[in-house]
A protein has these predicted regions:
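Sec-dependent N-terminal signal peptides
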Residues: 1-4
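Charge-biased, low-complexity intrinsically disordered regions
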Residues: 15-26
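N-terminal secretory signal peptides
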Residues: 25-82
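Short, surface-exposed beta-strand/loop "edge" segments at domain boundaries and coil↔beta transitions
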Residues: 36-41, 60-62, 84-86, 113-117, ...
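A generic structural signal for ordered alpha-helices
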Residues: 41, 45, 83, 110, ...
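Mature, soluble, non-transmembrane domains
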Residues: 50, 74-77, 88-158
């Protein structure tokens, strides 16, 4: 649980410019089903973030990707990986690899914008347990959309 709290509060990264006082503009993170149905929606104040948690489908170990609402742009800020199992790893030039307290690795300062403020995810089984965690909410994707395709989108109202 401490790792969960640490990673959620730590996923908020600095904006490249301070055009907006943190928390004064609120965007929404949406989960949209393959048929276009809105499955979930939660508030995300600008300059704050959220994390996508799941258990690796091969090893079962926890993996985390943390995003930031950087002035209305979805940005992948950091990622936690317990090891370099199938599909995991660090690529030179994409963030800074650091050892995590208690084991595993953080890839810090990835700061990679997500094209179109959205990405598609094939939600895993209940064992994979895909979930989005914000400072005030938790959306369990595996419970609502197991084995289906969803789009995770930052809605800025623009």
């Amino acid at each position: 649980m401490a790792a969960l709290l640490l990673s959620v509060t730590a996923c908020a990264g600095p904006a490249s410019q301070m055009e907006t006082k943190p928390g004064t503009v609120v965007d929404h993170l949406e989960v949209i089903g393959a048929d276009g149905t809105l499955l979930a929606r939660t508030e995300v104040p600008r300059q704050t973030g959220w994390c996508l948690y799941w258990n690796h489908s091969v090893t079962g170990d926890g993996v985390i990707d943390c995003y930031v609402d950087d002035l209305g742009k979805m940005v992948l800020h950091r990622a936690y990986q317990p090891d370099f199992a199938a599909g995991l790893g660090h690529y030179p030039g994409r963030g800074i690899l650091t050892s995590a307290e208690g084991g595993g690795y953080w890839i810090e300062d990835i700061d990679e914008p997500v094209r179109g403020n959205a990405y598609v995810l094939r939600v895993g089984s209940l064992a994979v347990n895909h979930r989005i965690v914000t400072d005030s909410d938790e959306i369990n994707l595996s419970k609502m959309a197991e084995h289906t395709r969803v789009t995770i989108r930052l809605d800025t109202g623009e």
